[in-house]
């Protein structure tokens, strides 16, 4: 197909600059407006993908009442430990941390990630009551427990999670109650709930403009000169510089992305129920609880994924479909 007079540009500028994420732990920039008391997110590890058969419950679908195929993602959900509480106040430049309190007894593995100073150790929960009038938001500092999974590491990830509730006093009472305790995913989410997934995508390394931006491959003399996979024109003579909008080669993948309105199909506590023959590729067996999410989730195996309550939940027109089968066949190719 030849060049048209008008056509959309190749690739999207929405996520520019396309560079590597700073951290493997995704940064959560927004939270659901939920009045339910409890945590609004939960960190998990991606085990792998498989497929399931669901009973179609859309009455207008030609497959209504029949089994339909759907890809599903299995995420391992080891318990998280609540290590601290942080109170935020409102300023002209946004939220500012007023004070924080750490649990007296900490997991020794947390020392691999951070060190709680003596100044912070002596603070008690009464210091949170002292700034209650100035507090507008309350969050807890939790860490994962990867040593209980098949992932070969002990160093935990630390995530800050917002506490939901109708009032600050209600949030504070809940945060005090869970300080120093471990929580499971059943304390945060339930089957059938819509969630958002936040994670860093698979890294692809340095890629050319054809794969990175989707520019057209040039034929004829361009192919003979060996420049068929390069951008045809990188801009005019003036201004004497290359615009940032020009599709060029560079980093592809390893970006933080958020996918909205994934649905929890199943929550389980025994990993053997969901582990396929031979284990998941590059992961192994699921040893803790798990969650089965409809569709795919960004990132490779072993990647930390934060499940957040849906910030713009979809309308649940037909309810949760019945799951009749989840494949446990070998993913090893034999």
Curated annotation (Swiss-Prot):
Keyword field contains Calcium: no
Tell me the PROSITE patterns matching this sequence: RIBOSOMAL_L3 (PS00474)
Could you tell me where the Basic residues compositional bias lies? 1-10
Alphabetically ordered keywords of this record: Ribonucleoprotein, Ribosomal protein, RNA-binding, rRNA-binding
| BP-aspect Gene Ontology terms | translation
Q: Which family does it belong to?
A: Belongs to the universal ribosomal protein uL3 family.
The UniProt subunit note reads as follows: Part of the 50S ribosomal subunit. Forms a cluster with proteins L14 and L24e.
The record's annotation in NCBIfam families points to: L3_arch, PRK04231.1
Q: What is this protein called?
A: Large ribosomal subunit protein uL3
Source species of the chain = Methanococcus vannielii (strain ATCC 35089 / DSM 1224 / JCM 13029 / OCM 148 / SB)
Gene encoding this chain?
rpl3
């Amino acid at each position: 197909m030849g060049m048209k007079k008008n056509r959309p540009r190749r690739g999207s500028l929405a996520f520019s600059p396309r560079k590597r994420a700073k951290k493997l732990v995704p940064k959560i920039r927004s939270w659901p407006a939920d009045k339910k008391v409890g945590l609004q997110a939960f960190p998990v590890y991606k085990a792998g993908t498989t497929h399931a058969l669901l009973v179609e419950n859309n009455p207008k679908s030609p497959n209504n009442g029949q089994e339909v195929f759907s890809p599903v993602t299995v995420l391992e959900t080891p318990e998280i430990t609540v290590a601290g509480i942080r109170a935020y106040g409102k300023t002209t430049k946004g939220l500012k941390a007023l004070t924080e309190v750490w649990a007296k007894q900490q997991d020794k593995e947390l020392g691999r990630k951070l060190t709680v100073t003596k100044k912070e150790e002596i603070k008690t929960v009464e210091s949170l009551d002292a700034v209650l009038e100035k507090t507008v938001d309350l969050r807890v500092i939790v860490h994962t427990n990867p040593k209980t999974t098949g992932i070969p590491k002990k160093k935990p990830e630390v995530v800050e999670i917002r506490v939901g509730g109708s009032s600050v006093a209600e949030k504070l009472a809940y945060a005090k109650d869970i300080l120093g305790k471990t929580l499971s995913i059943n304390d945060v989410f339930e089957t059938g709930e819509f969630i958002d997934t936040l994670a860093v995508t698979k890294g692809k390394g340095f890629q050319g403009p054809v794969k990175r931006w989707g520019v057209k491959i040039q034929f004829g003399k361009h192919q003979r000169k060996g420049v068929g996979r390069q951008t045809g024109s990188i801009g005019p003579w003036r201004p004497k510089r290359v615009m940032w909008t020009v599709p060029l080669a560079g980093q592809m993948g390893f970006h933080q992305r958020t996918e909205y309105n994934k649905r929890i199909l199943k929550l389980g506590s025994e990993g053997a129920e969901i582990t396929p023959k031979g284990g998941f590729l590059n992961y192994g067996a699921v040893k803790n609880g798990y969650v089965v999410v409809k569709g795919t989730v960004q990132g490779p195996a072993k990647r930390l994924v934060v499940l957040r309550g849906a910030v713009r939940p979809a309308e649940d027109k037909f309810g949760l479909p019945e799951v009749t089968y989840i494949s446990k066949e070998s993913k090893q190719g034999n």
